[in-house]
Structures are given as C-alpha cells and as structure tokens.
Amino acid sequence: MSHHRGLTVAAGLWPTFVVVDAQDRAALNTALLPLLLKTWEETSTGSEHYERVAHNIFAFENPAVLALKTIVLDLARRHYDLGDAFELEGHEIVSQDRQFIKTHVDSEEGDLTLQYFVRCPAGNAALAVNQFGNAAFVLVNPAQPAGSFRFPNEQHHEYPVLPRDGLLVMYRSYTPHYQCPYQGDAPMVQVVCNIKLKRVSH
C-alpha cells in the first residue's frame, strides 16, 4: 500500500539587485559636462533620445572619461565577477524641458547597466533619493510588468531613484526602466554605461 505525502513549496524567485551610489563628484562633472554636450551636439540627429549617431564615449582618450570608466568598473567589480572578457560602451543622454524616456530594457546592449547623472535638477539634491519627482529614474520589477495586478502583500512594481549630480545607479540590463518628465531650463545630462560580457563559443 503506497502513501502519498503532500508537499507545499513557496519561493520568492528572481529578485532584482540594484545599487545606488551617491558621491560628491563635482570636479568630475565639471570636466565631463562640456565634453558630453559637445558630443551630443555633434551626434544628435533629432529631438528624440534615440535619434543619434552611434558612438562610444569610452573610446575617447579624455581624462574625465577615463575617470568615469574607473568609477563605473570599480563599482561593478565590487558586486560582480566581470573577469577580463567584457566590453564597456557608453553614450550621453541629454534631456530638454518636458522630455522623458519610455519604458525599455538594455539587454541587447549589455548584461549590466549603469546610469551616471552629471547635471540634474538642482532641487533634487535636498530630497530623499528613493522617491518620484523631477526626472525620476524608475526601475520596474521584471517579474511583474507595469500594469499587472499587485496583491496587498506583494512588493511594489517600481523602484524610483531621484537623480542628483554625481549619482550612479547600477542594475541588470534586463530590468525594465523609464524616466519621468524632466522640468528645467538647462539641459539635463547623464551617461548610460553598458557592460557586456563576451560569450564563449563551444
């Protein structure tokens, strides 16, 4: 005679790991800003963020860019084993008044993505980082797409980060994200950095 024993398993699967790193990087931003604005003017082909000539700022032999590269890779290596077989690509994002970024993922460009904020709304610096507001950068739970139902005991779908000068956000590239509308006179400037590990062919 066989006996059947019941089994119940509950597992919180697939968490998303996010790092928010806010430091005083005023000197770096002062050096980066004119270079990024100049590059944007030379490569932008339209009013939308994606309308641009493809380029990689990390190919520039510029001291400020090299300093940013060091910061980005140091933070990434602090949390992930990158090894030596990877590529780092980055480009500037310049936002004008009322401009925003729609929900998307960066998994075609990288495995690990970092957003570095160079010039942000001045009022954001006095506010808490984890909240919505002017040009808030928002990460969306990849297991619960925007618009899906959330039970009261489930975590929120979204994690907002309020940009400020010198702030870095690091997340896996498959994580959906968007940016709320920016309000301001001077263009907002940030750099998106994608780290893509090289695949081993068998």
Functional labels for PLM-detected ranges:
Residues D21, F117-R119, N194-K198:
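Solvent-exposed residues in well-ordered beta-strands and their adjoining turns
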Residues L88-G90, L112-L114, V189-C193:
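Hydrophobic residues positioned within well-ordered beta-strands of beta-sheet architectures
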Residues M1-L82, F100:
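Non-heme Fe(II)/2-oxoglutarate
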Residues A27-L28, A146-S148, S201-H202:
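Short, surface-exposed beta-strand/loop "edge" segments at domain boundaries and coil↔beta transitions
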Residues D84-F86, E108-G110, P187:
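Residue-level preference for beta-strand/loop junctions
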Residues H91-M170:
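Catalytic core of non-heme Fe(II) oxygenases with the double-stranded beta-helix
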Residues D81-H91:
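A short coil-to-beta-strand element that immediately follows conserved catalytic motifs
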Residues R150-H202:
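Catalytic core of Fe(II)/2-oxoglutarate
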